[in-house]
């Protein structure tokens, strides 16, 4: 039988860094693309780690997993990114056991998002869990926890208004353009990159600017054509990027490249240019600001743009937290039961062995011994004894580890 219990010397950790302490440049150093994530999971498996989940988005890179010491997980991030241990120590965080559980709930439900109520992260957690599970790195604890977080996220989304109103990086970028670029409907807009943020930005641009001069460029042209077809936009080849940059009044860069793809060397400008870099790592070299007429805005600045919508969202935090507490309590109850279940089962086996021995002895000693009745009575007594122990271990005031150790010592049993 598979043993899903966490060995006592292992702890559940969440380690990583986020927008709270790490700026865009540092987050870029620690970002992990799909290949790096797979490599990290393979390394974890080779290191003997039994369960692990890794997420890497524009705003955070995090690992959730079991280890004897958090450095095992920190090393995995540093080994598979461009970040260093020294840099991590300055901006990173480490949460252990219940704090790590609390953190995943807050992240997955949008309460820890750079823009409050942004539920995009939950889809990342789902995808990351599926990836881990496919590689044999998701135990019962992790699966139950992720499902609990997904449940909390769904309930908060449907039962509160914490995600109401249009507030996202893509929406904020369009609002910035509308406020800072005159006659936007007649300007040339270039969108470079058609990932999730790029697509959302493009849809918002079409909706709010009424502009018919939006050009899309993507390294993979068919992705750009697919999006352009829906929105009736222009698509150009990646090889024409430098030419389109010259024509543009506004450029939105939302690529997933690991290094800058736009710098001053490819800009031959004859008019002012507004560049919005919505990428992590940054995909626009800051040297473009050395050119006259260029304004460079990064997503971190856009994320700080708060409005009435965001203030309204804050009113719904208590309701969201109440839902989290309810679901978290259910998870903790399950976790406690899972922790002591092997000990209770071992105790029941021990008592059954004592019963069998005693019934055998008495059946030989007593002439008219009624074994069937004795079996029924004994089983009821064993059930009552084990139930009493289980109820004690479920009690919030019980020190579970110490109680389990005491039970195993007194009855000379070993949970398997």
UniProtKB/Swiss-Prot annotation:
Catalytic activity reported: (S)-4-amino-5-oxopentanoate + tRNA(Glu) + NADP(+) = L-glutamyl-tRNA(Glu) + NADPH + H(+)
EC number(s) stated in the UniProt entry for this protein: 1.2.1.70
Active site residues of this protein: 58
UniProt-listed PANTHER family: GLUTAMYL-TRNA REDUCTASE (PTHR43013:SF1)
Record remark on domains: Possesses an unusual extended V-shaped dimeric structure with each monomer consisting of three distinct domains arranged along a curved 'spinal' alpha-helix. The N-terminal catalytic domain specifically recognizes the glutamate moiety of the substrate. The second domain is the NADPH-binding domain, and the third C-terminal domain is responsible for dimerization.
Assembly notes: Homodimer.
Protein name in the entry: Glutamyl-tRNA reductase 1
Lineage: Bacteria, Pseudomonadati, Bacteroidota, Flavobacteriia, Flavobacteriales
Record gene name: hemA1
């Amino acid at each position: 039988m598979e043993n899903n219990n966490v060995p006592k010397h292992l702890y559940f950790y969440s380690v990583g860094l986020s927008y709270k302490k790490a700026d865009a440049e540092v987050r870029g150093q620690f970002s992990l693309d799909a290949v790096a994530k797979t490599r990290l999971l393979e390394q974890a498996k080779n290191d003997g780690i039994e369960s692990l989940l890794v997420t890497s988005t524009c705003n955070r890179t995090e690992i959730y997993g079991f280890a004897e010491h958090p450095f095992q997980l920190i090393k995995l991030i540093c080994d598979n990114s461009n970040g260093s241990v020294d840099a991590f120590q300055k901006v990173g965080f480490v949460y252990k056991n219940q704090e790590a559980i609390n953190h995943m709930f807050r992240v997955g439900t949008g309460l820890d998002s750079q823009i409050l109520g942004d539920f995009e992260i939950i889809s990342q957690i789902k995808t990351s869990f599926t990836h881990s599970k496919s590689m044999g790195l998701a135990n019962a604890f992790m699966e139950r926890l992720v499902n609990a977080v997904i449940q909390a996220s769904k309930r908060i989304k449907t039962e509160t208004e914490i995600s109401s109103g249009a507030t996202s990086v893509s929406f904020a970028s369009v609002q910035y353009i509308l406020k800072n670029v005159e006659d936007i409907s007649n300007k040339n807009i270039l969108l470079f990159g058609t990932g999730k943020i790029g697509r959302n930005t493009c849809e918002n641009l079409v909706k709010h600017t009424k502009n018919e001069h939006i050009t899309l460029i993507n390294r993979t042209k068919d992705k750009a054509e697919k999006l352009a077809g829906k929105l009736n936009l222009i698509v150009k080849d990646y090889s024409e990027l430098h030419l389109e940059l010259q024509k543009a009044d506004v450029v939105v860069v939302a690529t997933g490249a690991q290094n800058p793809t736009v710098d001053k060397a490819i800009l031959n400008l004859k008019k002012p240019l507004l560049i919005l870099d919505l990428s992590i790592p940054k995909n626009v070299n800051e040297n473009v600001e050395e050119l006259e007429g260029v304004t460079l805005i990064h997503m971190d600045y856009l994320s700080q743009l708060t409005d009435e919508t965001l203030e309204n969202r804050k009113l719904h935090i208590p309701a969201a937290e109440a839902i989290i507490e309810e679901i978290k309590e259910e998870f903790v109850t399950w976790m406690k039961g899972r922790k002591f279940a092997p000990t209770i089962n071992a105790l029941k086996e021990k008592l059954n062995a004592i019963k069998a021995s005693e019934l055998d002895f008495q059946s030989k000693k007593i002439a008219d011994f009624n074994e069937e009745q004795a079996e029924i009575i004994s089983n009821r007594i064993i059930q009552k004894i084990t139930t009493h122990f289980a109820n004690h271990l479920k009690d919030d005031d019980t020190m579970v580890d110490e109680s389990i150790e005491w039970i195993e010592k007194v009855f000379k049993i070993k949970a398997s």
